[in-house]
């Protein structure tokens, strides 16, 4: 009895940690359940619904939101357990509309990029790693063709895939039935809006093709040209034409495109550069380096019979010249410049030591009425050799007495759809010959410049010239003015309509504003301005008003940054004046009158 009482009085020690853990594993406990119930928050379950409600309430304040949350929490106490859960079937219509709007914004951003297409956006499966991968595109010649900018060296995987696809579709065109009609109509509308804008992205490889393929042309301001005031010229300086990529040598030659806002420059750095002239940025469109060929003369040429046939002719002090084909067919199907070399004169090599001085003109066959281009080369011993602009074959030659110093081209309309091409050449003694190239170089007349000694330049103006060519046969006009420059700086100006019937015509004016050798003579397209310049000294350039023959007094000024002028060019519309100098810069001015 005593032993039993003693056993009952012995206290049982509480379970240690190991026993509690073992009992928990075997029998379980309510600790975890109680803790989870204490931490239970119904807001977590209804988080998506609350977010939708908050998105729909645009004008609610923070205090209002807090009151609504408390009200919702109070209502949850009276909700049955089976109503605390719901089947997610994609959300309500309002949230879907908002998501669709958000996706539309993203799609618009993606569509602004040239590398993203609708096919990539609607792809069934997209690998997110494609955007992280960087693919070098300068390793091989094949990948270099995928560049859209000269500044690119690496692109991500998405751009790489899209460019490979576009390159494939150039070879194997995409069938029309693949695209939806609505998509094709939208694309056509976008193309119509962009047509004529001529906005060039800096470094765009296809910029030249885009500009030449647009229908934008210079405005025809010559037909409605008003008379210039004789004393003051409204002129404003623009950004230098080659500010983005200046030349490494003097600008020896300038040429505006006959119909597009393009300017061609060339010099002894052996590089042709084409700039898109907008007066603000003047981006470089493309450039071409000719190894071992310093450039003395370069010019654009557009065929009268086929507007798509366009070339750039260039030459230096070498026994050959180059022709760069700019036809859209060649530029579209190949990223390599197509350049031909003219060097053979077929028995007349002794009369042509250098191809550096040349001009390009139009010649009409009197029998077939077909029109083709010709290249006129200033040779030695008084010769001028004439080549076919397409084949380079020697067609004819014209010879004068003495040493030829310069020549120019004039046109004479005969009847509707017919014209004559006249070659005017001068020697150092001021003796002038005029040849009819339609009659195999027949001499029309010969006359002498009054007081002409040491003649250096001759130029016609007021009609169709080599620097301002016509794009249609009906637009060809005979030139009214003829200017002759000399080593002493004198420039004699003749009116071809009145004073060219005698063998000793009298000039309408003798301009003596310059005192050094005349190196440039250029007329504005409408013949109201004569620009004369000398490269011997700085700032030796003057603009002469015609027909008053007075020099504009307000320009250039002592602060005009001309430098030593090496080349001058007017735009076909007459609204721009480009001046190249020995520093390799092309100054640009806008003539507000035009």
From Swiss-Prot:
GO cellular component: 90S preribosome; nucleolus; nucleoplasm; Pwp2p-containing subcomplex of 90S preribosome; small-subunit processome
Residue ranges that the Swiss-Prot or TrEMBL entry lists as coiled coil: none
WD repeat boundaries on the chain: 246-285, 290-334, 463-504, 513-554, 560-593
Acidic residues biased stretches: 49-72, 102-128, 180-196
Key word Iron present: no
More info: Present with 9570 molecules/cell in log phase SD medium.
Assembly, per entry: Interacts with snoRNA U3. Interacts with MPP10, UTP21 and UTP25. Component of the ribosomal small subunit (SSU) processome composed of at least 40 protein subunits and snoRNA U3.
Name of protein: U3 small nucleolar RNA-associated protein 18
Species the sequence originates in: Saccharomyces cerevisiae (strain ATCC 204508 / S288c)
Gene, per the UniProt record: UTP18
């Amino acid at each position: 009895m005593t032993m039993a009482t003693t056993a009952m009085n012995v206290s049982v020690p509480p379970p240690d940690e190991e026993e509690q853990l073992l009992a928990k594993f075997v029998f379980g406990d309510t600790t975890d359940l109680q803790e989870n119930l204490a931490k239970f928050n119904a807001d977590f379950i209804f988080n998506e619904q609350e977010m939708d409600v908050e998105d729909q309430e645009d004008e609610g304040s923070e205090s209002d939101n807090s009151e609504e949350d408390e009200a919702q929490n109070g209502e949850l106490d009276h909700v049955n357990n089976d109503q605390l859960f719901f089947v997610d079937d994609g959300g309500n219509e309002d949230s879907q509309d908002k998501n669709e709007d958000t996706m539309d914004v993203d799609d618009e951003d993606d569509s602004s990029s040239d590398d993203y297409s609708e096919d990539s956006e609607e792809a069934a499966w997209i690998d997110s790693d494609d955007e992280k991968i960087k693919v070098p595109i300068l390793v091989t010649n094949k990948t270099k063709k995928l560049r859209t900018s000269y500044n690119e060296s690496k692109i991500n995987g998405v751009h790489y895939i899209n460019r490979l696809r576009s390159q494939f579709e150039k070879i194997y065109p995409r069938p029309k039935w693949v695209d939806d009609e609505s998509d094709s109509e939208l694309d056509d509308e976008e193309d119509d809006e962009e047509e004529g804008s001529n906005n060039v992205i800096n470094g765009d490889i296809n910029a030249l093709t885009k500009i030449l393929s647009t229908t934008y042309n210079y405005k025809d301001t010559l037909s409605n040209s008003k008379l210039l005031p004789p004393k003051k010229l409204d002129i404003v300086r623009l950004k230098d034409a080659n500010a983005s990529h200046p030349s490494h040598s003097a600008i020896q030659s300038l040429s505006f495109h006959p119909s597009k806002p393009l300017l061609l420059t060339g010099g002894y750095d052996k590089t042709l550069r084409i700039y898109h002239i907008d007066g603000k940025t003047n981006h470089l469109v493309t450039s071409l380096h000719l190894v071992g060929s310093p450039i003395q003369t370069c010019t654009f040429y557009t065929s009268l019979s086929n507007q798509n046939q366009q070339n750039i002719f260039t030459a230096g002090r070498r026994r050959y010249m180059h022709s760069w084909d700019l036809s859209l067919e060649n530029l579209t199907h190949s990223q390599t410049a197509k350049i031909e070399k003219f060097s053979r004169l077929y028995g007349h090599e002794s009369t042509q030591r250098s191809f550096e001085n040349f001009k390009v003109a139009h010649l009409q066959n009197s029998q077939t009425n077909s029109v083709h281009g010709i290249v006129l080369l200033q040779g030695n011993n008084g010769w001028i050799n004439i080549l076919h602009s397409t084949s380079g074959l020697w067609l004819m030659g014209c010879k004068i007495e003495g040493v030829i110093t310069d020549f120019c081209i004039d046109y004479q309309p005969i009847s509707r759809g017919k014209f004559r091409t006249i070659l005017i050449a001068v020697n150092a003694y001021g003796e002038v010959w005029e040849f009819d190239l339609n009659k195999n170089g027949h001499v029309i007349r010969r006359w002498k410049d009054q007081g002409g000694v040491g003649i250096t330049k001759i130029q016609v103006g007021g009609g169709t010239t080599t620097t301002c060519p016509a794009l249609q046969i009906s637009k060809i006009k005979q030139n009214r003015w003829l200017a002759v420059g000399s080593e002493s700086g004198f420039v004699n100006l003749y009116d071809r309509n009145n004073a060219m019937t005698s063998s000793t015509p009298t000039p309408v004016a003798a301009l003596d504003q310059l005192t050094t050798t005349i190196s440039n003579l250029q007329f504005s397209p409408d013949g109201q301005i004569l620009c004369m310049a000398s490269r011997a000294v700085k700032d030796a350039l003057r603009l002469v008003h015609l027909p008053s023959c007075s020099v504009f007094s307000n320009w250039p000024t002592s602060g005009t940054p001309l430098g030593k002028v090496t080349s001058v060019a007017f735009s076909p519309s007459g609204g721009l004046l480009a001046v190249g100098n020995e520093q390799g810069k092309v100054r640009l001015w806008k003539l507000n009158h035009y």
